[in-house]
């Protein structure tokens, strides 16, 4: 006579659980959007302050925002991306600029 739980493969269940636990986290692109009012110097400041770019790379990204309408500032896990978006948007509002920082799934 067979055991009651022959139909369950406990080893496979354990492997599936471990595999699920080891999946890499979802990643998100943090982007700056162009507007007609935020000074270029402020965008450079944001890129240096919140994304740790040197002045040269920050200037390149600022020009991408200016000419293409948006630029990816970095790719992060959900929690980090959400925090950076919130911090940049709050900083822009505190300085009375309409600069918009957004995120989207990478």
Curated annotation (Swiss-Prot):
Binds to the N-terminal domain of the chaperone ClpA. One of its GO terms (biological process) is protein catabolic process. InterPro entries: ClpS, ClpS_core, Ribosomal_bL12_C/ClpS-like. The gene is clpS. Involved in the modulation of the specificity of the ClpAP-mediated ATP-dependent protein degradation. SUPFAM superfamilies: ClpS-like. Belongs to the ClpS family. This is ATP-dependent Clp protease adapter protein ClpS. Pfam families: ClpS. Transmembrane segments: none annotated. NCBIfam families: PRK00033.1-3, PRK00033.1-5.
């Amino acid at each position: 006579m067979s055991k009651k739980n022959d139909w369950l493969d406990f080893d496979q269940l354990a492997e599936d659980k471990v595999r699920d636990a080891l999946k890499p986290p979802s990643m998100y692109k943090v982007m700056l959007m162009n507007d007609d009012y935020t000074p270029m110097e402020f965008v450079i400041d944001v890129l240096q302050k919140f994304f740790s770019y040197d002045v040269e790379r920050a200037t390149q990204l600022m020009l991408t925002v200016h000419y293409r309408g948006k630029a990816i500032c970095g790719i992060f896990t959900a929690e980090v991306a959400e925090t950076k978006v919130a911090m940049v948007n709050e900083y822009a509002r505190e300085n009375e600029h309409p600069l918009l920082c957004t995120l989207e799934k990478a």
